Amino acid sequence: ISMSCDIRICSDNAVFGQPEVGLGITPGFGGTQRLARLVGPGMAKQMIYTARNIKADEAYRIGLVNAVYPQEELMPAAKKMAAGIAKNAPIAVRHCKQAINEGLEKGMDEAIVVEEKLFGGCFESYDQKEGMAAFLEKRKVEAFLNK
């Protein structure tokens, strides 16, 4: 499930693995595809073929997780990160996600076209106007309204 998430953080006692080959099956539900896209095909093959579990520090080192926190700091860190995302213009965050996801499925030139269209789409929003005005006026954004 975690490999389906945009951002993955864990506590320092987390353990990750793909044990399926030890059960005589392949990882399902996108496990082979998501892992390869996150950590690269070589590391994904090693993890899947050996069915070896890895600890949080190794998961961070190979790019499976974005950050590792002590257990008692995990939830506050997650809330802080969520608040940091939530304070930004929802339309812009959504367009960034779309640009990244769609761009990964295309060549660089096509991906840039996707990004340009989404970038331009932001200029039709109230949130862009408020964000740019606040920047130019050297003040905080009053509110992003998701429109």
Residue ranges and their predicted role:
Residues 20, 102-105:
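A short acidic, helix-capping loop that chelates divalent metal ions and anchors anionic groups
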Residues 47-48, 99, 103, 118-123:
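Helix-loop "lid/cap" segments that line or gate small-molecule binding pockets
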Residues 107-112, 146:
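Short beta-strand->loop
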Residues 1-91, 125, 130-133:
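Crotonase-fold acyl-CoA enzyme core
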Residues 133-147:
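Terminal low-complexity tails and localization/encapsulation signals of metabolic enzymes
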Residues 93-101, 133:
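Acidic catalytic patch
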